[in-house]
């Protein structure tokens, strides 16, 4: 990108006593993008968001907004409203008074703030609830009020800290669609913290994956899904079979990965790896094939016994175990599994093309 980033973290770290919550971080966030920061509990994602919001002060480094350092700028002067999981709505105010509140604090006149609040309630599809108290609303309706309250001030950037985690599955999916549509229509930069892969991948333009206070990978959902950079990312996403091993040469001089359950051919371009180097081969569970016998000409095949099956809607996930005790899984549409004679305890051969493998560093 040629323009300057809307937000930049330069060497930003956060320590609480002897504990480092965020190690030195460099991150650029661009105008108009939907950025998701994802990771398990304690990875530093919420601390990162709170530093941007002005609720935590960096221990070192500089945070810039529109090119200007904001480390010493109080939260109320940053134009970075935040939506929390708890929503933090005022129960003693009506719906429209909640939406008006930030405008009132900014000195906007009564008529103008009422007009803008009504516009956002209409936009969020909750205009009919303007006079109700917060306690009379459903979870999804409260979520829309919280969004309207944050967006009515027309910020450059909106921060969201796991705002959908308390909603049921169906409502969560609907709200994901609402959020993405709002972001596209307004052009406001969204920074969204979550532990949910489905939320991050369905909405974000780019995803940041964090672990133990460090960024593991930044990229589009497609790039991260297809090509995780590290063993941690592959494990965290949970969509790949992982074969840990070392780079070696087979009897024909070809570069392979030697693992406890066999030697496997590598994708093109892997010859540059050094023999003996510890790596892992990842293969998406959707790219694995199931057969009664070793497929003729297959370079990568491993025998395994079926140990379980999980119904996941339009697809099924079949679980296998190798003789060495490694669990593998295959995910396929139901129609692709109908003629395989699947049964718990039965032995099969799992295979994949070398081009479907991906090497990650340990």
Region locations from a protein language model:
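ABC ATPase nucleotide-binding domains
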Residues: 34, 79-81, 85, 89-235
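The feature captures the beta-strand-to-loop junction immediately N-terminal to the Walker
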Residues: 38-40
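ABC ATPase nucleotide-binding domain helices that frame the ATP-binding cleft
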Residues: 46-49, 145
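Conserved ABC transporter NBD signature motif
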Residues: 61-69
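Non-catalytic connector elements of ABC transporters
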Residues: 240, 250-362
């Amino acid at each position: 990108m040629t323009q300057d980033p809307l937000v930049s973290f330069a060497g930003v770290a956060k320590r609480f006593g002897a504990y480092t919550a965020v190690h030195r971080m460099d991150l650029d966030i661009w105008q108009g993008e939907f950025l998701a920061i994802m990771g398990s509990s304690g990875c530093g994602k919420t601390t990162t968001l709170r530093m941007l919001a002005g609720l935590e002060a960096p221990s070192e480094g500089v945070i810039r907004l529109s090119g200007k350092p904001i480390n010493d700028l109080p939260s109320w002067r940053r134009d970075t409203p935040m939506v929390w999981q708890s929503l933090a709505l005022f129960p003693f105010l009506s719906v429209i008074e909640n939406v008006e509140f930030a405008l009132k604090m900014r000195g906007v006149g009564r008529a103008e703030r009422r007009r803008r609040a009504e516009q956002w309630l209409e936009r969020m599809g909750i205009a009919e609830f303007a006079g109700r108290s917060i306690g009379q609303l459903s979870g999804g309706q409260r979520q829309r009020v919280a969004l309207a309250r944050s967006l009515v001030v027309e910020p450059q950037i909106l921060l969201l800290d796991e705002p959908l985690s308390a909603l049921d599955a169906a409502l969560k999916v609907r709200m994901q669609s609402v959020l993405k549509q709002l972001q596209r229509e307004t052009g406001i930069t969204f920074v969204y913290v979550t532990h949910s892969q489905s939320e991050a991948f369905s909405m974000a333009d780019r995803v940041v994956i964090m672990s133990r206070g460090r960024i593991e990978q930044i990229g589009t959902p497609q790039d991260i899904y297809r090509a995780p950079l590290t063993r941690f990312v592959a494990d965290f996403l949970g969509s790949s079979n992982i074969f840990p091993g070392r780079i070696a040469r087979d009897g024909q001089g070809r570069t392979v990965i030697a693992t406890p359950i066999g030697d496997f051919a590598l994708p093109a371009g892997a010859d540059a790896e050094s023999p003996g180097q510890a790596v892992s081969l990842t293969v998406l569970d959707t790219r694995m094939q199931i057969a009664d016998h070793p497929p003729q000409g297959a370079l990568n095949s491993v025998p395994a016994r079926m140990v379980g099956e999980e119904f996941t809607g339009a697809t099924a996930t079949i679980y296998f175990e190798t003789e060495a005790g490694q669990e593998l899984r295959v995910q396929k549409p139901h129609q692709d599994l109908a003629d395989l004679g699947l049964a718990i305890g039965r032995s099969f051969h799992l295979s994949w093309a070398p081009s479907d493998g991906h090497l990650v560093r340990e």
